Amino acid sequence: MDVLAEANGTFALNLLKTLGKDNSKNVFFSPMSMSCALAMVYMGAKGNTAAQMAQVLSFNKSGGGGDIHQGFQSLLTEVNKTGTQYLLRTANRLFGEKSCDFLSSFRDSCQKFYQAEMEELDFISAVEKSRKHINSWVAEKTEGKIAELLSPGSVDPLTRLVLVNAVYFKGNWNEQFDKENTEERRFKVSKNEEKPVQMMFMQSTFRKTYIGEIFTQILVLPYVGKELNMIIMLPDETTDLRTVEKELTYEKFVEWTRLDMMDEEKVEVSLPRFKLEESYDMESVLCSLGMTDAFELGKADFSGMSKADLCLSKVVHKSFVEVNEEGTEAAAATAAIMMMRCARFVPRFCADHPFLFFIQHSKTNGVLFCGRFSSP
């Protein structure tokens, strides 16, 4: 799984840098479900198409496709397991034009490794019906949070292959922010601009560290059950978030976020309440990273999927996150706060300017989500 965690982590940071080229924009996506969806397509790719995909997804480090697909099988089983104290719904499906005659071996592998189906639709003569069908499937899989994945006109009678990838997550904090402490504060979008934000506050014991080389504090906020953590990277006010993003490699990310190397200390945390819903057309992003052949008819080689001449027509990724006060240990935590207020100096972690955040699965080190909060 480590090789896969490295591949997915490298891809995650490359995507973060590409999607975040515009400094002022918020970014939120799920690198794990994106890798997962593309790995499924990679199973059916051959030749140069496969080589480009392997490079963009950082699979070339891992020496071979088979291990990758088995790795995803274990990862998905682990992350989507029932009985967890968080809700995570990933929806992956390939929708293909029904006249293309997809190989049963490919369909079986999708099911076996990716818990995903290949569904055939009639894009040629029932394009709008196909679009609505895809949208209702996604809405059902994401508890209604993601309703209109494909906008009108986004598929047409020439569409051959649509890769749909949506993900919904809801987790409660291991320790809750008391709603009574939430108040309107100013968020410094840039040196010259401020916006109002609902700022949550809590004083408690968390793992945190300071990375001197990028002048950045890192704080770990665990979700209930401690299977998932939110890792927040907050640069000093004198340091641009861009600098942090430039320096970030997967190796450094692992080194900087090692829980066993962090101090557990009492800290005053101020974090904005926010909701992000981002949608990305991934074709241009993936092309800019070097995966060009897959989207071009005549160049794309998906002969492991179908004998028909195929190319990827559409890769859409939409994700939704809401960060608020909710948690479970409210009563105990609140009482404790009152007693600690007058204690010794407590370090502050005040996220009132742009920061990066990652939601990570502790057991597999998988980065489930990746985001940048630049502006309320």
UniProtKB/Swiss-Prot annotation:
Main location: cytoplasm
Location(s), subcellular: Cytoplasm
Modified residues (Phosphoserine): 151
GO MF entry, a single one: serine-type endopeptidase inhibitor activity
Keywords: Acetylation, Cytoplasm, Phosphoprotein, Protease inhibitor, Serine protease inhibitor
Site (Reactive bond): 341-342
Positions of modified residues (N-acetylmethionine): 1
CDD domains the UniProt entry points to: serpinB6_CAP
Domain of life, per lineage: Eukaryota
N6-acetyllysine found at: 195
A GO cellular component annotation in the UniProt record: extracellular space
Protein family: Belongs to the serpin family. Ov-serpin subfamily.
Known function: Inhibitor of cathepsin G, kallikrein-8 and thrombin. May play an important role in the inner ear in the protection against leakage of lysosomal content during stress. May be involved in the regulation of serine proteinases present in the brain or extravasated from the blood.
Assembly and binders: Forms a complex with the monomeric form of beta-tryptase.
Protein name: Serpin B6
